[in-house]
Amino acid sequence: MSDTAEQRWSVYLIRNNRNALYCGVTNDVERRFNQHQSGKGAKALKGKGPLVLEWSCAFENKSMAMKAEYFIKQLTKTKKELLVQESAVIQVGEGQSFVFYSRK
């Protein structure tokens, strides 16, 4: 098995100083967050610190993590805030699609 196949991939949400949530995918959340903080990450976060890692969720492989990232990016800010507050979850549904569930 290759190193890539054994890695856990995660989706994460980072809050910037404008209260916006940035969504990304990585195989090492701590390393990637440190890159964002040092200005070596996404252009969307440069100069918008302090940054706060608000949420992350691990997936079984890179493909699923990237699908989850796309799904989360399509959510409204309100729904992303529910994920951060742990008042909602996303789950893999039929056909490897994602479903948003509120915990109310």
Curated annotation (Swiss-Prot):
One Pfam assignment: GIY-YIG
Gene3D superfamilies assigned to the protein according to its UniProt record, in alphabetical order: GIY-YIG endonuclease
Recorded superkingdom: Bacteria
Domain GIY-YIG: residue ranges: 7-82
Homology family: Belongs to the UPF0213 family.
Protein name as it appears in the record: UPF0213 protein VIBHAR_05350
